Amino acid sequence: MKAALDLKPTLSIKTEKEYEAYSCSDMECADVPLLTPSSKEMMSQALRATFSRFTKEQQRLGIPIDPREWTDMHVREWVSWAVNEFTLKGVDFQKFCMSGAALCALGKECFLELAPDFVGDILWEHLEILQKDSKQYQTSEITPAYPESRYTSDYFISYGIEHAQCVPPSEFSEPSFITESYQTLHPISSEELLSLKYENDYPLGLLRDPLQPESLQGDYFTIKQEVVTPDNMCLGRISRGKLGGQESFESIESHDSCDRLTQSWSSQSSYNSLQRVPSYDSFDSEDYPPAMPSHKSKGTFKDYVRDRAELNKDKPVIPAAALAGYTGSGPIQLWQFLLELLTDKSCQSFISWTGDGWEFKLSDPDEVARRWGKRKNKPKMNYEKLSRGLRYYYDKNIIHKTAGKRYVYRFVCDLQSLLGYVPEELHAMLDVKPDTDE
């Protein structure tokens, strides 16, 4: 296959109709930068939401559920699907000429060498999800009492799923695959779909309610899909379901992968906002079955941190790990890391607020890149690669470059609703002086 010369980062989520028209021969592969805080950024989470469509592809092509059982052709079909689904460019298919068992045995570091930056992260994330799902599928002893259709999900979900605001479920009819992309039914961007992920991958100490019984963490149930219209779909809609006459299991009704589309928003108005940053959980407890305890109460990130520890003057006001746990973004993302540095007084020599709202300056961009590389275990990270991730934020209305000022950027998403801080409050806490440099 002819390698693409244009490596400009691109990422798009195709609708189901576009997916049907997909031809492997028309496909080229690609380079995808960090995901964003509109719903979060780098590999975080609705990987399940977008990757769920691979279940249909597995059914169509007869690809085994367990990736360790894949042949060389299965591996190629999987990579081809991902390339088409995300409009990736820059992937060398020859590097993936191996069996599924060999692919899974590579380990993360070796696997990431097979694809360009960020593309490898996406593929690895999906491969891990597929392996976990196959284990759950093999160990489950629950047999559905209803006939499964061709597109009935093989996935499982746990009580550990984040809660979502729901509307009353429709009555169950024949299992049906939702043919419209989630993106076509809601004003949600592609990176929001990609930013959801397993709770099993989150820092357990940050996400689990200490009062929640451990026994609930390991309970899994099969998903029963229902016919859902756009009018009654919601983000990661959860409801009570029945399986073989047994009540009180949780099912996702809009899409088998919506178990990660449960990111909530700090206010109802933010549903209609183009600059949205999700809060971790802003829904009422009555939206959930009484058997499922909530992870935490409502509140901003400020409340979330205050409930867990007193602020230490020698530590960042906004630790990236805590912010990742609060938003449910999984791995720490670039925007979260930048906020950590910006709220750490010891880092003001190389990155700091300018004193003008959410604007900040990289006084030493190489040092920022070095620290980001150290945090992500990528020793080859440099400012050129870091800036590629920042540029990806421009079109997403997450971060903008300030015109006429070198290395100066501004958060343009709604950080105030997410964090619970106004910029002036953070500036005062950090003794920020207005930047007089032109």
From Swiss-Prot:
Residues 415-419 are annotated as: Helix H4. Residues 423-429 are annotated as: Helix H5. It comes from the Eukaryota. Keywords: Cytoplasm, DNA-binding, Nucleus, Phosphoprotein, Transcription, Transcription regulation. SUPFAM superfamilies: SAM/Pointed domain (SSF47769), Winged helix' DNA-binding domain (SSF46785). It is found in: Nucleus; Cytoplasm. Residues 128-240 are annotated as: Activation domain. The keyword DNA-binding applies. Disulfide bonds: none annotated. PANTHER family: ETS (PTHR11849), V-ETS AVIAN ERYTHROBLASTOSIS VIRUS E26 ONCO HOMOLOG 1 (PTHR11849:SF309). This is Protein c-ets-1-A.
